Amino acid sequence: MSKMYHAVAALGVLTGCGFIATEMQAATPVADPLLHLAGRWVGNAVMTPSSGPQSSFKCVVTYLPRKDAPGLQQNLRCDDGANFKLHAATQLQVEGNKVIGRWQDKINDIDGTVDGNVTPTGFEIRLDGRFFQATMAVAGEGCDQSVRVLPQKSEVFRELAATLKKC
């Protein structure tokens, strides 16, 4: 066999190996950077109103991993036992380091879109809707998590801050 034939054969083998390696990498599932938040988190929250004293209440936040893509469904339920209730659901999809999705406040019947970024310990997103806009930052490590919501317009409240535990 000629040297040219060996060179072409070797190139074909290398190209084939590269194609197989690329296909194997493409088939590898993408790691979900928010998976460490999955589970049920319980704790206390403080709402700072636009005027008047702060109010404290209990919160339960659950995160369910999505089956169709990297990301989570966040269910946020806060209640002071008397006047304040918040039942919100957020669908979060991760694309690279971006977070997109939709949110819904089930008590006030409002909803909107989600856009933000993955952070080293969670995510920071903007909640945009017709009647409500805010930023939300979630950070969780080990057994501890913090959730902070800052509305763009502080007609009702200026800040909602929760400290949660999973363990």
Feature locations, PLM:
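Bacterial N-terminal signal peptides that target proteins for export
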Residues: 1-11
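Intrinsically disordered and other compositionally biased segments
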Residues: 7, 24-26
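Cleavable N-terminal signal peptides
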Residues: 13-14, 24
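Central antiparallel beta-sheet cores of small beta-barrel/beta-sandwich binding domains
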Residues: 27-139, 148-167
